[in-house]
UniProtKB/Swiss-Prot annotation:
It comes from the Eukaryota. GO terms for biological process: ubiquitin-dependent protein catabolic process. This is COP9 signalosome complex subunit 3. It is found in: Cytoplasm; Nucleus. GO terms for cellular component: COP9 signalosome; cytoplasm.
Length: 423
């Protein structure tokens, strides 16, 4: 090894043994150019360092190796990164979360380029566990996990990180920006959409859309389009966004989503024929946006919505009559819709196969069984937990020096602007 590299290795060993992690972080930040100039010797450097004891030094070397314009032996590098993430010292890594996250982003991008997303899911899961301070902390690599899960069509591993409510963001030494936040909620929304958990999907799209912004984000635009479609499927209308939504949405994003607003407008007429015509009119737009599958589900949901409206008017109805009223092709298609809706608990009905009649029933739920009481109890506990968290966050803000300084300044401005009561 060149003498400069030997000095780097010795410094990493010494600072690691002394527990001087801040100084070690400064060293690895300054050593990027040195390592990049000695690419052929980097495997020797890795051999001289212990992954557990010298995690930050190994991280610096792997980060530089992955930053090369072309990677000569990807399989070897992948194995090195995989071993590092699974065995590195989590406490050390938290001193250089920006570099650690950068390495994970590089790994994700490389696997996406090679069309091998499945290989990275387990590795990125381990990386999140190493980096998180708690399960409710969002990191920039959560979005990487969701992206890999989507591309691999393997949703289950990501659900453990999507089903929790995020209360905190890992600052990553100031390197965290809005894009990974948006990616987590956008990709997460797509995963929930694929699983037909539309309520959770809507929440995730809403988080992406309502992110404070001064400029148009393509991710926010795509989330907005999907928000409209999922809202129609779930509620039969577009749910209004919160008042704190950025003005960027109304000023720029809405005009870029005209086809989707037209779809929502026609959907509200409850006329499937008109909706089909509009889908044909904007077929190219919906296909280009990769939203045609959701658009078809919107059309299907309109048929279901119209069938649900019939339950409020009729006690019994023939399948043929139902088909003509909701504009389905015939009794067979009407029967298919009714059976699916009964299975999903969207209506309560039975079909008499002899005469082809549908009998609609009242909901059997009386809200007096142990399961329902357990659900209510769980919801109450969640509300109590949320209240405790809000109080803790409020207290944290109250004692924040920046907040105190700003609030004191505004109070002085208010008192200075008040007219004197004395002449």
């Amino acid at each position: 090894m060149a003498s400069a590299l030997e000095q780097f290795v010795n410094s990493v060993r010494q600072l690691s043994s002394q527990g001087q992690m801040t100084q070690l972080c400064e060293l690895i930040n300054k050593s990027g150019e040195l390592l990049a100039k000695n690419l052929s010797h980097l495997d020797t450097v890795l051999g001289a360092l212990d992954v557990q004891e010298h995690s930050l030094g190994v991280l610096a070397v792997l980060f530089v190796k992955f930053s090369m314009p072309s990677i000569p032996d990807f399989e070897t590098l992948f194995s090195q990164v995989q071993l590092f993430i699974s065995t590195c010292n989590g406490e050390h890594i938290r001193y250089a979360t920006d570099t650690f996250a950068g390495l994970c982003h590089q790994l994700t991008n490389a696997l996406v380029e090679r069309k091998q997303p499945l290989r990275g899911i387990c590795v990125i899961r381990q990386a999140i566990d190493k980096m998180q301070m708690n399960a409710n902390q969002l990191t920039s690599i959560h979005g990487d996990l969701c992206q890999l899960s989507l591309l691999a069509k393997c949703f289950k591993p990501a659900l453990a990180y999507l089903d929790v409510d995020m209360m905190d963001i890992c600052k990553e030494n100031g390197a965290y920006d809005a894009k990974p936040f948006l990616c987590y909620y956008y990709y997460g929304g797509m995963i929930y959409t694929g699983l037909k958990n539309f309520e959770r999907a809507m929440y995730f799209y809403e988080q992406a859309i309502t992110t404070p912004a001064m400029a148009v984000s393509h991710i926010m635009l795509e989330a907005y389009k999907k928000y409209i479609l999922v809202s129609l499927i779930l509620h039969g209308k577009v749910q209004q966004l919160p008042k704190y939504t950025s003005q960027v949405v109304g000023r720029f994003i809405k005009p870029l989503s005209n086809a989707y607003h037209e779809l929502a407008q026609v959907y509200s007429t409850n006329n499937p024929a008109e909706l089909r015509n509009l889908v044909s009119k904007h077929n190219e737009t919906f296909t280009r946006d990769n939203n045609m599958g959701l658009v078809k589900q919107c059309l299907s949901s309109l048929y279901k919505k119209n069938i649900q409206r019939l339950t409020k008017t009729f006690l019994t109805l023939s399948l043929q009559d139902m088909a003509s009223r909701v504009q389905l092709s015939g009794a067979q298609e009407a029967e298919k819709y009714v059976l699916y809706m009964i299975e999903d608990g969207e209506i309560f009905a039975s079909i008499n196969q002899k005469d082809g009649m549908v009998c609609f029933h009242d909901s059997p739920e009386k809200y007096n069984n142990p399961a329902m009481l357990h659900n209510i109890d769980q919801e109450m506990l969640r509300c109590i937990d949320l209240d405790d968290r809000l109080k803790a966050m409020d207290q944290e803000i109250t004692v924040n020096p920046q907040f105190v300084q700003k609030s004191m300044g505004s109070q002085e401005d208010d008192s200075g602007s008040k007219p004197s009561s004395y002449s």
